[in-house]
Amino acid sequence: MAPPSSIMATSSDVTTVKIILSMMKRTLALTALTLTSSACAYPSITEISDPPAVEVPMIQYELTWKCDDCTPEEQYVLEELQKHTKIKDRNALATILGNIKQESKFIPNICEGGARVSYTECKVGGYGLIQWTSIGRYKGLGNFCAKYVCDPSSLEGQTRWMINEPIFQRNLPVFEGHDQSISYYMKPAYYWLGWGIKGNREIYAYDYTKKMVLV
């Protein structure tokens, strides 16, 4: 009976060896796969020396004219003009500011003669930032604010009307030009405002150019 026991033991050993070899093959295969995957995770020498181009998004920042030495009212009008028109020329902006200063000193609720009253209480002469005088232009301010819900006595409401008023819009293309002198821009300013007395509006305009910086 001894020989059969020896044969069974040998067969068991062979089976064990086969199992071990199978497990080793599987382990080696997994190791090779892992190494291959790891190698693929790193760039090649060619990729390192000549990396692919990467498109960097461009962030556009538009420069605007600021006037730190101006009053809050002047700064507001300057900002709104640049926000709602294409006026880029400092001289053009300064000309508009100079004319407003001559007309009202940027006091929105001023009636011609100096009285500070609401829109409905100015009975004679011009009113507001640019001294709207004719019945059509004066009523235009009130009608605009009634339609677009703004205060016709306020700086905000009057600035909106000033920019949107048809007579300003007709002259706007000239103000939106470039590299012209203040004297040049005074012509469309006259067509816009139709002043009777020129006063210091051109001098004021030159003063603004000295205070305005592009940032």
What are these regions (language model features)?
Residues 52-81, 101-181:
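Peptidoglycan-targeting cell-wall enzymes and recognition modules
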Residues 177-215:
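Active-site or metal-binding loop neighborhoods of secreted/extracellular toxin and effector enzymes
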Residues 90-97, 183-187:
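Alpha-helical scaffolds flanking conserved acidic
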